[in-house]
Each structure stands twice: as structure tokens, then as C-alpha cells.
Amino acid sequence: MSGENRNTTQRIQKILNSEMLKLNILASVTGLFVAILTWIFLELIDLIINVLYLGGDYLDNDLGYWAILIPGIGGLIAGIIIKYGSKGARGHGVPVVMEAVAINQSKLGTRLALTKIVAAATSIGSGFSLGRVGPVVLMAATFGSDLGQRAKLSVEETRILIGAGTAAAITTAFNAPLGGVIFAMELILSEMRTRSFIPLVVSTVMATAVARSMAGDLAAFSDLPAYTIVSSFEYPLYLILGLVIGLAAVGFIKLLYAIDKISENG
């Protein structure tokens, strides 16, 4: 009996000393703090909207035609923040993270992330047509990278923490846990392995619990009307619609990069 107890104790010690357990604990910590930071970012956007539009929003405010000037003011402030913060914040957040994971040993700059977050919140709050994905992903990935380096993790393990942070950020920003995991695995880690999948799920579960405790279980798109298929003839039309939208998306992306390139050269 004592031999069995000794074997059980050894197994427990082996589990407690395992790198996988350590990684999952750090992934849980990442999910906790990233959820809080992402919620603060979203609240900051709402605060800026409230201040700039005098208690209203983009469309419903008392500024009249003066509201047209608000995005310009916000853009000017964001430009100043980027100039004196980090000029790298001009770019897109997700590609910066992908580059760090692929060729920069999973290292990201804290100053860049802070500048990106503040500038993005100012831009979005003033009315710019910008998304939340890039800023929150960069912020979350930077947190994961910094935590991994402080915990003396390997480059590979730090890379997984970056993915865990990314998954937690998407989960919190859009209330989409599954979407967060898939986004991180496909775009950031570019792999489907158990070693990376489990920490991502752990981080996402923690982020979901924290986010819903603060903001409630609200769907990103909660007011969509119910829709039912009336005829089987609709299916070919959906295929055509998908093709058209896909081509339009490719064209939009190419146009976006072309304008970005012209802006940099100018």
C-alpha cells in the first residue's frame, strides 16, 4: 500500500513540476489580465465618444454640422500620440504580432502596444472607421510575450502565450470564445497541436468568465432578425453572393494596401 502511495505521490509531483502545467497556469493568468485590459480599452472608447460628442454618439448628438469636425480632431490627437509614442503604431496590429511570432523570437515592445491602444481608442472614439481587432490583439500578444519572458519560458512557450493572449482578446472584444481560439491558432500560431490548443482553451475560458462577469453575456450582434430558407433555389444565389463578396473583399484589401503604400511614399 505504501508503494502505491509513493507512486501516486511521484505522479502528482511529476504533474506539478511539468512544463505543461506551468504553461497552462500562465495561460490562465494571461486570460484574466487580457480580459480586464480589453474591457478597459472598450470602456475607454465609450468614454472618448461620450466626451467628444457631448454625451451623445456618432449619429445621435447635439453638435449638428459641427460633428463633422470631430473625426479630424481625433485624427490629429492620434497622430500626435503616435509621433511621440511609437511610429510603429501606424501599422496594423495583427501583422506585427505575426511577424514577431515568425521571425522576432516572439518579442514585442510594450511602448508600441500602449501607443497603439491609446491612439486606436482616440481614433475609434472620434468616429474613424477602424476595427478593434488590431489594437486588442497587439495589446494581448504583448502581455503574453512579456509574461513569457519574465517567467523565463522558451521562445516556443512564449509563442503559445502570445496565442493565448490573442484568443482571450478576441473572446472579450466579441464574446466569441470559439472564434478567439480559431483566430489565434490559424493566424497567429499557424498550427493545430494539442500542446498549443489546451493553453488557448484555458485562457479563453478564463477570459470568458471574467468578461461576462463584468459586461454580461451579450452577443456582438444580438438584434438580428430570424431568417428561414423559403426555397432550395436560394442556395445557388448564396454561392453567387459568396463569390461576389469574396472578390469584393480581395479588391478592397488590394486597394487598402495600395493607398497605404502611396501614403508612405508620399
What spans do the regions from the language model cover?
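Alpha-helical transmembrane segments and immediately membrane-proximal extracytoplasmic
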Residues: M1-G266
